[in-house]
Amino acid sequence: MTAKIVIAGAGSIGCYVGGCLALAGKTVTFLARGRVAAALARDGLRVTDLDGRDHRFAAGSLSVEIDPANALSSADIVLVTVKSGATLDMAGLVDRYAPSAAVVISLQNGVENASRIAAAFATPRTVLAGMVPFNVVLTERAGESLRVHRADRRPYSG
């Protein structure tokens, strides 16, 4: 069985990490707001880095959802990649819609976010803290794929 991974917050970090997971053959759904969801559906996603990675996902080739219930209801893993200010709102959506067995991983700036997520759940869940030790730049140009670029050479596995 392939784990269904939901990227809960399809901004620069979410799109980059999700794109890398999709490149590795993982089943990924992006939970995105309207503007990003529309850009991904219309123009696709381009994942690049300083080491020469340059991959385009064609329009319509990625699973993109704007409805949290649809995105989260069958998640095995939820990667929370929203800005810290939106942590509790996203935790509420995960609590409401994701299966209780789903593993939740915070990939956010700030040392308290994983514990804030765990505290927001009505019943205990597995919540882990992760980190993204590199910068990602998101570029959006009309008629081009939404581009996420790893903008430094710090090592990562992916």
How would you label these PLM feature ranges?
Residues 1-51:
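NAD(P)+-binding Rossmann beta1-loop-alpha1 motif at the extreme N-terminus of oxidoreductases
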Residues 73, 109-158:
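Rossmann-fold dinucleotide-binding core
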Residues 45-64:
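N-terminal glycine-rich dinucleotide-binding loop that anchors FAD/FMN and/or NAD(P) in oxidoreductases
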Residues 78-80, 106-107, 129:
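Redox-cofactor binding/interface segments in oxidoreductases and associated redox assembly factors
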Residues 58-100:
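Rossmann-like NAD(P)-binding element
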Residues 3-4, 76, 125:
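Nucleotide donor/acceptor-binding cores
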Residues 94-112:
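ADP-ribose/adenylate-binding Rossmann-like module
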Residues 12, 85-86, 111:
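Residue-level detector of alpha-helix initiation sites
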